């Protein structure tokens, strides 16, 4: 079953600021996650226990998403450089209950 991709409004702004190259890299990984969003190794903890991450190692970027199994939605809540965990702090503020 394939999930539907949604963006938090602030995450969409962050997405649009990315270079086309980074967008393409994330698109490729997101396409796989839409088929199987619950990747154990990518699961976050603490305040973000309902979220998962996608990492672009060389670029140093992170994408944090939340999964709603009832509605079959993968919601991108934040993305950006890992710089001092700012992307994770943004994700904490934007999570849906």
Where do the PLM segments sit?
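Enriched for short, Lys/Arg-rich terminal
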Residues: 2-4, 13, 58-62, 66-97
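Residues that form or immediately flank small-molecule/cofactor binding pockets and catalytic motifs
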Residues: 10, 49, 81
């Amino acid at each position: 079953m394939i999930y539907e991709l949604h963006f938090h409004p602030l995450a969409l702004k962050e997405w649009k600021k990315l270079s086309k190259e980074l967008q393409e890299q994330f698109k490729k990984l997101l396409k796989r996650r839409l088929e199987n969003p619950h990747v154990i190794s990518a699961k976050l903890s603490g305040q973000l226990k309902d979220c998962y991450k996608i990492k672009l190692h060389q670029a140093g970027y992170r994408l944090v998403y939340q999964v709603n199994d009832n509605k079959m939605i993968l919601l991108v809540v934040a993305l950006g450089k890992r710089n001092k965990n700012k992307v994770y702090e943004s994700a904490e503020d934007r999570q849906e209950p």
